[in-house]
Amino acid sequence: NITAIAVTAFLVVFQPELRKALEQLGSQNLLSGILAQDDGKSSQEFNDRTVNELVRATFEMAKVKTGALMVIERGTSLKEIERTGIEISGLVTSQLLINIFEHNTPLHDGAVVIRGNRVAAATCYLPLSDNMSINKALGTRHRAAVGVSETTDSLTIVVSEETGRVSVAEGGMLRSVPTAEALRNILSG
């Protein structure tokens, strides 16, 4: 009986840490080598054209202070996040991204998930970071970008609606991206 109480107390006290550990374990493709399945990525790779379209859209939106949140899938699947939004499955173009994030459109709230050269989904919910060191002046969009980068290997582009500044979240860190060329280098690297 005392063992059951101790286990329950342990689970309650360490719930956030256990959840994070399980998320990270679950996000690693442990079976991918064994179950090698074709996910269609080979014909839809993230390429230079996609990079150019993303850079163009990002800095066009920054110029007019249109808030945006674009999550680029890498090794870790973002299917769970994608399920929280609306399927798009459209080729990445600057026009599509700008239209999605246009303020008075139905799709502007939330994030888009980009897989290869496609916008997989829009209006997606992202996990918010618990990191208390994130600047308080930054809003929910930035906290969400850091949050998804803490639990996946994704790269997230953020455009601030307040300032028009562009940032990138990767590996739990948020960094400012001052120029289109700097963003192009990050996306190509």
Regions found by a protein language model. Name each.
Residues A9, F14-G189:
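Divalent-cation
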Residues N1-A4:
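Membrane-water interface of transmembrane alpha-helices in multipass transporters/channels
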